[in-house]
């Protein structure tokens, strides 16, 4: 089921997501979640997907082999840092999984099969990054679809929508901004953020594992406008 609504149809005190839920309910579609398709223009486009079930679960050490495989897949590796073998992956993600680091790590599933991973964190907990991106009050997130067969099928938009709406926003009470910063050459990632209603802001240089810098594009999602008004 496809849902389209113009921005003028969004009510006062109502986010785009809430407006889409209202339209879906009026049409009698309440059995499946309403997902973003493309919020970059007007009308806003959503859908109810009867073909896929999207879910997230906490990452565990048992997921490390999949993470290693995903970050070495060509479409991911070109944007990834040096943490590409099992030892480095365990060193990098282990503190978060043990509760020693406030970053939360998740595995994405489509129809019960693991396809990638994502993370969320308070940017203020990472002072050096907060200084670079100038968004200390925002909630940061990063994401990877590791399975090449799942790329360029519109699934990334749906997966991120479920992640941000159902897990990130409820976990950070009062958060008004969600923030991600892909490499400026990563047009695929920039486009998926645009489809989620993100706006591009500051370009800044972020140190990379090779001792140089990567120029990234700060992208912000206004929580009240896009996901949850109250």
Which residues fall in each region the model found?
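Acyl-donor (CoA/ACP) binding surface of acyl/acetyltransferases
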Residues: 1-47, 60-64, 113-230
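Short glycine-enriched loop/turn motifs at secondary-structure junctions
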Residues: 49-51
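Residue-level recognition of the N-termini of beta-strands and the immediately preceding loop/turn
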Residues: 54, 104, 175-178
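A short beta-loop-alpha structural element at the N-terminal edge
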Residues: 54-69
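Conserved beta-strand positions that form and line the central face of beta-propeller blades
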Residues: 55-58, 107, 218
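Helix-loop element at the rim of GNAT/NAT acetyltransferase active sites that forms part
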Residues: 69-83
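Active-site rim helix/loop that mediates acceptor-substrate recognition in acyltransferases
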Residues: 83-105, 110
């Amino acid at each position: 089921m496809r849902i389209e609504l113009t921005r003028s149809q969004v009510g006062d005190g109502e986010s785009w997501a809430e407006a889409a839920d209202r339209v879906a309910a009026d049409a009698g579609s309440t059995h499946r979640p309403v997902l973003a398709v493309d919020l970059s223009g007007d009308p806003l486009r959503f859908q109810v997907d009867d073909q896929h079930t999207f879910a997230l679960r906490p990452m565990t050490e048992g997921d490390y082999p999949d993470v290693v495989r995903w970050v070495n897949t060509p479409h991911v590796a070109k944007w990834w840092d040096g943490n590409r073998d099992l030892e480095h992956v365990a060193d990098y993600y282990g503190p978060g999984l043990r509760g020693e680091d406030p970053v939360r790590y998740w595995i994405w599933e489509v129809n019960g099969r693991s396809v990638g991973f994502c993370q969320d964190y308070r940017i203020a907990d990472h002072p050096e990054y907060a200084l670079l991106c100038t968004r200390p009050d925002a909630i940061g997130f990063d994401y990877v679809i590791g399975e090449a067969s799942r790329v360029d099928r519109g699934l990334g938009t749906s997966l991120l929508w479920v992640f941000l709406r159902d897990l990130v926003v409820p976990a950070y009470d009062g958060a008004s901004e969600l923030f991600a910063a892909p490499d400026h050459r990563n047009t695929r990632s920039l486009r998926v953020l645009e489809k989620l209603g993100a706006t591009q802001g500051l370009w800044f240089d972020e140190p990379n594992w090779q001792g140089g810098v990567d120029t990234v594009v700060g992208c912000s999602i206004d929580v009240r406008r896009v996901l949850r008004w109250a």
